[in-house]
Amino acid sequence: EDLQGTAVQERSAKASDEEEAIRTLLLTNVEFNRPFVLSIYDR
């Protein structure tokens, strides 16, 4: 039971790490793309 519980914890930790990485990537892309997005919406 302990082994299984540890495996589940590791899996959820890995998932949150990936979500964090994706979120960071998206935020970075938004910051980077803001001038382009603004120029598109400014038309």
Swiss-Prot record:
It is found in: Secreted. One of its GO terms (biological process) is acute-phase response. Keywords: Acute phase, Glycoprotein, Protease inhibitor, Secreted, Serine protease inhibitor. Its main location: secreted. One of its GO terms (cellular component) is extracellular region. Disulfide bonds: none annotated. The keyword Metal-binding does not apply. One of its GO terms (molecular function) is serine-type endopeptidase inhibitor activity. N-glycosylated with carbohydrates having biantennary side chains. Plasma. The record marks 23-24 as: Reactive bond. The keyword Thylakoid does not apply. The reactive center loop (RCL) extends out from the body of the protein and directs binding to the target protease. The protease cleaves the serpin at the reactive site within the RCL, establishing a covalent linkage between the serpin reactive site and the active site of the protease. The resulting inactive serpin-protease complex is highly stable. Belongs to the serpin family. This is Alpha-1-antiproteinase 4. It comes from Equus caballus (Horse).
